[in-house]
Amino acid sequence: MSPPSQIKPPQGTTPVPPSELDPRSDEEIVRSISAHVKPTDSEKNMWAYWHSGWENMPPWTKRNVVHWARMLGTEWTVRVLDGIPGSANYYERFVPPHLLPSAMRERRMSGPYVATHSADFVRLPLLFLYGGCWLDVGAILVRSIQDVWDVLADPKQSYEFAAFTYMMRPGEASIINTWMMGRKNMELLRRWHDTFLHLWGDKSSCDGLHKHPLLSHLRPLSSLTHGLITDENNEPVAKTDKIIDYGAQVYCLDRLRDLVDTNDGWNGRQCIEEKTFLLAALDEMWYYQPKTDYLGSRQFELLTTRYDAPEPQRGDAEEFVNDMLANTMLMKFCHGLKDAMVSSLADIWDDPKHDGTDCAPGTFAEYLRWGTLHLRQTRTLEPVKLTAPAGKLHHVAMFEPFPSTN
């Protein structure tokens, strides 16, 4: 499709030349994603995970992944790993057992977040062993990641890792794990995964991880419960301990950020400052959220607006989509903690009765999908510095608790 002539591409974008558009059919791309492709020396790997396999993914997430492959072209190998023994992309075909917790090796993980934490346990080893990009399947790429990869691959640059940051506490940002790009064999990735493995131990679920001595120094969360995890009255609907349990992998990196390893002198703060290319999540991943009061219902309303809708409905939808096409890197639609969001577009699109509304012909959802492939942003991504907490670094061994500050 091409959008109606009355829709003008936004300032800050330029048309992608037809010669640069991927000519493959969706079916051809799906076959390439579903096949087992052994890693090579190339680090241009796009990694994702869906516990029950490609065929069982919600259709809108399949379209997301096909779209990644089309945007990146054949230079990148896109894989969606799964938890099905014997499948072409079973995670153990790529991640050796010693890098997985016993609960995963023995298939005894339990609780509502088995799929989420299974993905957590493969994302870091995949980047460490093979390099490339990790992205959750609930994300629509708005612009190519190639320019970020070019920075990481440039021998004149010090960067080896890229990710988003989010302000979890006043004056303190965390590096989050939805989108990450890393060079093979990066030390930070190894230490991060080792810390998460140690934290998890032989547990079968995340319950109680907030009590672990390695995380006992963390200050209470604040802004994480603003907007994304609040009700319609902006009141928190999830307790801090449950949030830390769920997102424990992220908080393991908070620990490494403040660690100087007494065994070998490795300095987490220095490593992050020198080797990580960081972008603000509220600018480059959740840019759409405050624009819609964090309401999935409002996002759904805008994207299902038809081109011939009356004003101001039509104008609002066009303005919203054009803003996304020009000003953000991707749009990640979250499920997150169970019952922790008053309205989630991911939940709406998961509902079979809304199948196809993420790309319905004649709607601004269709225009969003079209624009991400046919328009190219002209802005340059500029890295931000991680906002670390005030106070000294902790000189301890890798798995030694930080001294109490009480």
UniProtKB/Swiss-Prot annotation:
EC number: 2.4.1.-
Pfam families the record matches: Caps_synth
Superkingdom, taxonomy of origin: Eukaryota
Region Disordered, residue ranges: 1-26
Signal peptide: none
Family annotation (SUPFAM superfamilies): Nucleotide-diphospho-sugar transferases
Keywords, sorted A to Z: Glycosyltransferase, Transferase
Pathway: Mycotoxin biosynthesis
Gene3D superfamilies noted in UniProt: 3.90.550.20
First-level EC class: transferase
GO MF, one annotated term: glycosyltransferase activity
Keyword Transferase: yes
pH dependence remark: Optimum pH is 5.5.
Keyword flag Glycosyltransferase: yes
Thermal effects: Optimum temperature is 35 degrees Celsius.
Role, per record: O-glycosyltransferase; part of the 2 gene clusters that mediate the biosynthesis of fusicoccins, diterpene glucosides that display phytohormone-like activity and function as potent activators of plasma membrane H(+)-ATPases in plants by modifying 14-3-3 proteins and cause the plant disease constriction canker.
Family label: Belongs to the afumC glycosyltransferase family.
Protein name listed in UniProt: O-glycosyltransferase PaGT
Originating organism: Phomopsis amygdali (Fusicoccum amygdali)
Top-level taxonomy: Eukaryota, Fungi, Dikarya, Ascomycota, Pezizomycotina
